[in-house]
Amino acid sequence: MTDNSRLRIAMQKSGRLSDDSRELLARCGIKINLHTQRLIAMAENMPIDILRVRDDDIPGLVMDGVVDLGIIGENVLEEELLNRRAQGEDPRYFTLRRLDFGGCRLSLATPVDEAWDGPLSLNGKRIATSYPHLLKRYLDQKGISFKSCLLNGSVEVAPRAGLADAICDLVSTGATLEANGLREVEVIYRSKACLIQRDGEMEESKQQLIDKLLTRIQGVIQARESKYIMMHAPTERLDEVIALLPGAERPTILPLAGDQQRVAMHMVSSETLFWETMEKLKALGASSILVLPIEKMME
C-alpha cells in the first residue's frame, strides 16, 4: 500500500533523460537503488519514492496528482499540455525550475533533394511526427495547412516509406536525418529537462522536503557551472587578472612566503575558463594556474 506521507517523484525509466535524472538525484544526496527492474524505488535516507515510468506518462501523473514531482523534458510536457487543452481540460502544475540537461530541439526536416523556401513549402503537405500538437500550433501561427501523420517511433523513415512528405522530430546531431536522406530546415521548439510539481495542497513535511531538494539542485547546478581557480599573481596587476574572470566572486588573496611581488589567489568563477583566458592570465604574469571542478556548492 502506498504511503502518502512520502514524496513521490516520477522520472524516465530509460532513455534520454534517465541517466541524467539518476545522476542529479545522487548528487543531491538521495541514496536509492535504481539498478533493479522495480518500477518504484524507495530512498534509503529520505522519505522519497521514485516512480520509473515512460517519459510521456510523467506530465499526466503530475497533472492528475498521482505523483508530487516529475522530471521531464519541456517538449513532452508542452505536448501533453496542448493535448489536454484541446480536449477541453484545464491542466494544472507548477514548473519549479529548468534543469541543466536534456537539451534538444524539435525540428522540421525534408528530403535533401527537395527545394526549401521556408515553412510555406509545407502548405498542403503530409508531415509525420510524434508531436502533433506542437507541430499544429507552430504551423497554425503561420497560417499553413497540412496533414498530420502520427508516428510513435522511427519518424525519420516516413518520407522514404511514402508515408509523409516531411517530418517533425527531435534532433540532436542530425546524423539520423542525414542517414535517411533528410535535412533539418526549421527549428520549431527548443527544450530542456525541467522539474514540475503537482497543483493543490501539499503537506507541510512534503513541502519542506521539496524546498530542501530545490536548494540541493540549485547547488548541484551551480557547482557544474562553476570552477575553483587558484593561481599566483603579480601584486601590481591584480585588477587586470580579476577583470579576466567575469562572474567571479571577489577573490581570496593570501601572501606568498618570501615573495613580496606576488600573492596567491583563490576564487570561484561562474564561467568556463577557456584556454585563451588561461593564456591571457599567464601573459599578465600569473603562474601555477589550477582550474578545479566543484562537487557541491551552497551560497
Curated annotation (Swiss-Prot):
PROSITE patterns, per database record: ATP_P_PHORIBOSYLTR
Record field: catalytic activity: 1-(5-phospho-beta-D-ribosyl)-ATP + diphosphate = 5-phospho-alpha-D-ribose 1-diphosphate + ATP
GO molecular function per UniProt: ATP binding; ATP phosphoribosyltransferase activity; magnesium ion binding
Regulation: Feedback inhibited by histidine.
Keyword Oxidoreductase: no
Localization: Cytoplasm
Single biological process term from Gene Ontology: L-histidine biosynthetic process
Stored InterPro entries: ATP-PRT_HisG_long, ATP_PRibTrfase_cat, ATP_PRibTrfase_CS, ATP_PRibTrfase_HisG, HisG_C, N-reg_PII-like_a/b, N-reg_PII/ATP_PRibTrfase_C
Pathways per UniProt: Amino-acid biosynthesis; L-histidine biosynthesis; L-histidine from 5-phospho-alpha-D-ribose 1-diphosphate: step 1/9
Record keyword Secreted present: no
Keyword list, A-Z: Amino-acid biosynthesis, ATP-binding, Cytoplasm, Glycosyltransferase, Histidine biosynthesis, Magnesium, Metal-binding, Nucleotide-binding, Transferase
Function description: Catalyzes the condensation of ATP and 5-phosphoribose 1-diphosphate to form N'-(5'-phosphoribosyl)-ATP (PR-ATP). Has a crucial role in the pathway because the rate of histidine biosynthesis seems to be controlled primarily by regulation of HisG enzymatic activity.
Entry's family note: Belongs to the ATP phosphoribosyltransferase family. Long subfamily.
NCBIfam families: hisG, HisG_C-term
The protein, known as: ATP phosphoribosyltransferase
Species annotation: Escherichia coli O7:K1 (strain IAI39 / ExPEC)
Gene assigned in the entry: hisG
